Every structure is written in structure tokens, then in C-alpha cells.
């Protein structure tokens, strides 16, 4: 009887040591070849975070949402799950592009993407070149129309998926 009790206790202890799978899906580094750009436009050229050829930022055509972030940015970490959820619903209707700024090492940005469920293209701006084109601070989210015109700039953290959906409908005319 003592052995049975000991076995039972061991089973309970082992059951308590199991982990549940993470709610965050695995992200992936996506190349930037799917982005629609106007090749005649000159401007701030950034490489893709995956190491592939990048784009000239001002040449981007939408409809697109551009989210400027950094792995070191607390509010960016806070809002990223909202972008992941939003993108799962909106990926067939618009382009989502991230720009990783002022990162100490490219590996930090790549790790951020891979561990937060991010599955859209991201550009890499290690030295703040986008500041002249986009302004300073993170997070910032831009809504870009089909002609490449920024129609709205949200400064600060996105607080809900509903906010993203509302801004997308209001400024890009796309219901998600």
C-alpha cells in the first residue's frame, strides 16, 4: 500500500511539472519581395530584416499599415500581439510592414519577430535613417493609401484590435 501511495504521489508531481504550450505562435522572418513599390521613387533605402534585398521606404504603395517598433520598446511589446491578431484577419486585404529601428544588433530584431508570432515583412533601420522620413519615436503606426500617401499617423501604442480595425476602415476604406 505504501508503494502504491508513493507511486501516486510521484505521478501527481510529474503531472504538475508539465508545461502548457505557449499562446504565442512562432513567428518567421519574411522576405520583402511581396511589397508593392514604385521603382522610380528615390529615398530612404532599408534592408529587409531577414537579410534579403530591402526597399526604398518612400516607394511603398498600399493599402498598407507600417508599424515602427524596436525590441527594446515596452509599448511595442505590448501592442505586437494585437498586430498579430489583426494580421490574421487582414492579410488578404492589405500589406502590413514593420520597421525595426535603432536595434543594437540585427539578431535582437530577428529574435523579436521569431518569438512573437510576427509573419509579415519587416525592414531593419539600425541607425535611425527613417527618422527624416517618418519622424522619431516608437511605436508609431502609419496608414498608407494605394498611391503611397500617408493618410494617417498614429503616435503611441495601439490599444486594441478594434482600434486597428476602426483606423483601417476610416483611413484606408477597408473593413476587416
Predicted feature residues:
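Thiol/disulfide oxidoreductase modules built on the thioredoxin-like
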Residues: 111-119, 125-176
